[in-house]
Amino acid sequence: SFAGILSDADIDAALAACQAAESFKHKEFFAKVGLSAKTPDVIKKAFYVIDQDKSGFIEEDELKLFLQNFASSARALTDKETETFLKAGDSDGDGKIGIDEFADLVKEA
C-alpha cells in the first residue's frame, strides 16, 4: 500500500478527479496524488507497490488496474487509457514500463 508514502487526502482527491471513463491523465494524477514532488527513492517505492507480480516491470494488465493500488474500489482504466499510459511510459518500446521509465514518467508530471 501507499501508507507512509502518500496522504489519504491526496489519494482521494486524485481518484475523485478521474472517476469518469476516459478522464484519467497520468500527469494530472501523479501531480494530484503528490507523487511527482517526491524523491527518487519514494517514487521507486511506489513502483514496487504497482508492480504486483514483482517482475521488475509494470505490464499492461498492471497498468489497467493502476488505480486499484490506491483504493480497491477504484475503477479499472479503459483500454484506451491503458494504451495511452503505456505509450507515455514505455520509452524503449518493449511493451512494459521499467523502474527508470516509471521515474521519468512521474517526474514529467
Curated annotation (Swiss-Prot):
The modification N-acetylserine is found at S1. Ca(2+) 1 binds at D51, D53, S55, F57, E59, E62. GO terms for molecular function: calcium ion binding. Gene3D superfamilies: EF-hand. Residues 38-73, 77-109 form the EF-hand domain. InterPro entries: EF-hand-dom_pair, EF_Hand_1_Ca_BS, EF_hand_dom, Parvalbumin. One of its GO terms (cellular component) is cytoplasm. Keywords: Acetylation, Calcium, Metal-binding, Muscle protein, Repeat. SMART domains: EFh. It holds the Pfam family EF-hand_7. Coiled coil: none annotated. Ca(2+) 2 binds at D90, D92, D94, K96, E101. Belongs to the parvalbumin family. Three parvalbumin isotypes, in nearly equal proportion, are found in toadfish white trunk muscle whereas only one main component (IIIF) is present in the swimbladder muscle of adult specimens. In muscle, parvalbumin is thought to be involved in relaxation after contraction. It binds two calcium ions. This is Parvalbumin beta. It comes from Opsanus tau (Oyster toadfish).
